[in-house]
């Protein structure tokens, strides 16, 4: 059985009942909003793009926000912004912890919905709030983003901000991942529990990727010699554990503890 099959066979552990309820609620409420803003993780934009959310919200104007851009490579983020733009999708990069993000996001929404706002003005609906559904997978910073708006809470899910009504939806995943890469990426950022995968194998996969893209940063972070880059991934994990003093009796490296670091 492949790792992807193992992950999907354990879906009950990472797709609890409340996520099913969230998808049903989304299907019910989508007709009551003017726009959908999906929060993605700037480090893994495609892996954090939920196909179930895409399916449910397909009929509404759709915007994306690449959150946690402070943790991503800025040059790669520029490429992702260009990618979304080429696909005709409104998109911004942001750090939801940074002050002033709410203003930039509101500007994007207003730009995307300019035609709708003009129609409303022509009909005398000047005071009508724009209703925006905020969606995303767990742990992409959606709550921090919502809290960046100095708004007034109306009920359990609605927040009023200036000319906007924001509908905050709980983070939700989808039932089956199409690849091990997607599942691994989601585990890396904490969107699914990392114990669904073998933690040491997961860490080795991450080290292998980082070593290929950012070798010097890897060496600097763990104070390793250049020779470490030639090691097999598991040996590299052991070298990092040894540097950090993560040893067990007999002087062996505690690779499980190192992998969780």
Question: Where do the language-model regions lie?
Answer:
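Glycine-rich phosphate-binding P-loop
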Residues: 131-154, 169
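Structural beta-sheet core signal
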Residues: 38, 64-66, 134
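Canonical P-loop GTPase G-domain recognition
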Residues: 69-135
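Short, well-ordered alpha-helical segments in soluble proteins
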Residues: 109-120, 138, 149-153, 173, ...
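Helix-rich effector regions associated with P-loop NTPase G domains
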Residues: 1-35, 43-51, 56-62, 69, ...
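Conserved active-site beta-strand-loop modules that form the wall/rim of enzyme catalytic pockets
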Residues: 96, 143-146, 164-165
